[in-house]
């Protein structure tokens, strides 16, 4: 069972919890196009199939795809409460939120690192997650600002690294593993 393997890891970070979330799993890759979003969705659906309450956050601001993968109609927007909090979309039993849900269609994000990290943190903290056992975060590719901000400010339970067998992808995957180790986030597994 997937849930049993993940549950054995507990974050030891002294960071504030994300309201309504017990465990946060980051799904990351060193480079794009390796199947990270597909893995994130499949992990979320597998945990849900085992009876867990699961959410998924699309933190890939520059190339969000979770909405499309879950069949959320293009242009559909989450409800907003108190002019501040997003109500996550529901799709296939998963609670979901994405920058794609709160920005205009086909508008490329041309933000720099601090703005992007701030937007991801805002999306994470201002979504009304409803008592999740697991929140799967589909990270953008690489080991940059978003990954470091998340590692330093969010109690991430563990990470799953996604790669392909090509030499470049494997090297980038190793960088991702090393980054998570340096910030004391256990790597739960590598998907190739």
Regions found by a protein language model. Give the residues of each.
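Residue-level signature of catalytic and energy-coupling elements of molecular machines
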Residues: 21, 32, 58, 66, ...
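Phosphate-binding/switch loop-helix module in NTP-utilizing enzymes
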Residues: 100-150
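Phosphate-binding loop that captures ATP/GTP phosphates
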Residues: 47, 53-106, 111, 117, ...
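Short glycine/serine/threonine-rich phosphate/pyrophosphate-binding segments
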Residues: 33-42, 64-67, 139-147, 169-172
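Extreme N-terminal, non-catalytic leader segments
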Residues: 1-28
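Walker A/P-loop phosphate-binding motif and the immediately C-terminal alpha-helix
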Residues: 23-60, 177
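Conserved catalytic-core segment of NTP-binding enzymes
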Residues: 126, 133-192
